[in-house]
Swiss-Prot record:
The gene is phpP. Its main location: cytoplasm. Binds 2 manganese ions per subunit. Other divalent cations, such as Mg(2+) or Ca(2+), cannot serve as cofactors. Its cofactor is Mn(2+). This is Protein phosphatase PhpP.
Amino acid sequence: MEISLLTDVGQKRTNNQDYVNHYVNRAGRTMIILADGMGGHRAGNIASEMAVTDLGVAWVDTQIDTVNEVREWFAHYLEIENQKIHQLGQDEAYRGMGTTLEVLAIIDNQAIYAHIGDSRIGLIRGEEYHQLTSDHSLVNELLKAGQLTPEEAEAHPQKNIITQSIGQKDEIQPDFGTVILESGDYLLLDSDGLTNMISGSEIRDIVTSDIPLADKTETLVRFANNAGGLDNITVALVSMNEEDAE
């Protein structure tokens, strides 16, 4: 397994409210965490870094070695972090703080993930890009209800309004999923600064190109910037080899 992480402020923003990192626990199991923060001043920066770092530090201290244990851990620790960031957000300086969250652990040939917000996790297998997560957003709710066409959703003025975030008052309802991995698969975690700028087919073409993994993440970010770079752009790309998929 090989991992490449990259974050970029983009072309229009003055600060980067995204955060990404990866961690290994005492059983040697890898977790990748990506967050896209929101809130005035530095609240978004703090929320995203805090969520990633708190969860990462907690993961490093575990001996978790099974998919079922990971799912229980996700359910427990994501709500703890939600309440922690919500409490901090009561301070006037951090009013409105919150963050999306993508958390993915790899146990042998399985990936298990938790999803909150409108960042995304995708699987690139062969010549196909599969979006594994469904955005927790107002526009996606309208789309699923048949009140918007995909074209209308793409250009909707309220596209950035999310229906769930880490830091909300109510208990979060994360989406969980697992994927059986095959040799040659790629997993991509990204903030919406990537997927709002480039298509799934462009992502697939870059990820399956014959260049080193770090060059693939750089190319993804460069394409998003060339398309306008309207937001911070963050990617975590994981390449699975034969030993991982056995």
